[in-house]
């Protein structure tokens, strides 16, 4: 594709992102049981919304956080994220299925999942104290054609569903799962990357004795990270997934 056409396509998609729908985690399946997430397009309008395993947010526009908020609490569990009151039990070593609402196919980027121990009750933990370790990440899968195939494309192909395995080595206890899409369609400009962090409470049973070292949510990213400030409308020889290294325990 000619460079002029690539530039034009980038501009069109960046403009479209202002009006295109975005998404959020509507439910998860853990230990074979379905749990409703925080329904950001309906629960905020209820006087007494149902309790959920998903953290509440005020992102009723289904919008995003960007690089200007990487040192702000909003990047941790989305806009004004507030503790979920329920937790989903899950066996260490088992899989959790995460269901998103329909994700726009123009919003290419990585899908990343973290855990953080609450060291107690996740319904009351101070989110600014949570230290996240990365348990799953899929970025650029294939770049044989611009803009490439990404984790988001894999998610869409699976019916807007993502499956992640809880490490079998981590200690039993209460954890916040921070599951996130970073859309890169406008990321060639500083603060153009769009973060969609979603937090959910898990009660991990079984497991080992692992207590992975984590990173505070407000220190996960910098707006100049190579996986954040990147032009996906050029051929990429390599893509570095943002955030700390993947937990290998």
UniProtKB/Swiss-Prot annotation:
Q: Which cofactor does it need?
A: Cu(2+)
Extent of the signal sequence: 1-21
**Summary of the protein's practical applications:** Lignocellulose is the most abundant polymeric composite on Earth and is a recalcitrant but promising renewable substrate for industrial biotechnology applications. Together with cellobiose dehydrogenases (CDHs) an enzymatic system capable of oxidative cellulose cleavage is formed, which increases the efficiency of cellulases and put LPMOs at focus of biofuel research.
PTM comment, free text: The catalytically essential N-terminal histidine His-22 is post-translationally modified by methylation to prevent protonation of the histidine side chain, and protect the critical active site of the enzyme from oxidative damage.
Alphabetical GO biological process terms: cellulose catabolic process
Q: How is the cofactor bound?
A: Binds 1 copper ion per subunit.
Q: Which residues bind O2?
A: 185, 194
Stated EC number for the protein is 1.14.99.56
Per its record, the protein catalyses: [(1->4)-beta-D-glucosyl]n+m + reduced acceptor + O2 = 4-dehydro-beta-D-glucosyl-[(1->4)-beta-D-glucosyl]n-1 + [(1->4)-beta-D-glucosyl]m + acceptor + H2O
Localization, per the record, is: Secreted
Sorted alphabetically, the keyword list is: Carbohydrate metabolism, Cellulose degradation, Copper, Disulfide bond, Glycoprotein, Metal-binding, Methylation, Monooxygenase, Oxidoreductase, Polysaccharide degradation, Secreted, Signal
- EC top class, in one word? oxidoreductase
Q: What's a single GO CC term here?
A: extracellular region
Question: Which positions are glycosylated?
Answer: 34, 80
InterPro entries, alphabetized = AA9 (IPR049892), AA9_LPMO (IPR005103)
The GO terms this record gives for MF are: metal ion binding; monooxygenase activity
Please report any disulfide bonds recorded for this protein chain, giving both cysteine positions: 77-199, 118-122
Q: Where does Cu(2+) bind?
A: 22, 107, 196
Q: What is its main location?
A: secreted
Oxidoreductase as UniProt keyword: yes
Family named by the database record: Belongs to the polysaccharide monooxygenase AA9 family.
Let me see what the UniProt entry remarks about domains. Has a modular structure: an endo-beta-1,4-glucanase catalytic module at the N-terminus, a linker rich in serines and threonines, and a C-terminal carbohydrate-binding module (CBM).
Its biological purpose is as follows: Lytic polysaccharide monooxygenase (LPMO) that exhibits a mixed C1/C4 oxidative cleavage activity on cellulose and xyloglucan. Catalysis by LPMOs requires the reduction of the active-site copper from Cu(II) to Cu(I) by a reducing agent and H(2)O(2) or O(2) as a cosubstrate. Shows a higher boosting effect with cellulases on the enzymatic saccharification of complex lignocellulosic substrates associated with xyloglucan than on the lignocellulosic substrates without xyloglucan.
Q: What is this protein called?
A: AA9 family lytic polysaccharide monooxygenase A
Its taxonomic path starts at:
Eukaryota, Fungi, Dikarya, Ascomycota, Pezizomycotina
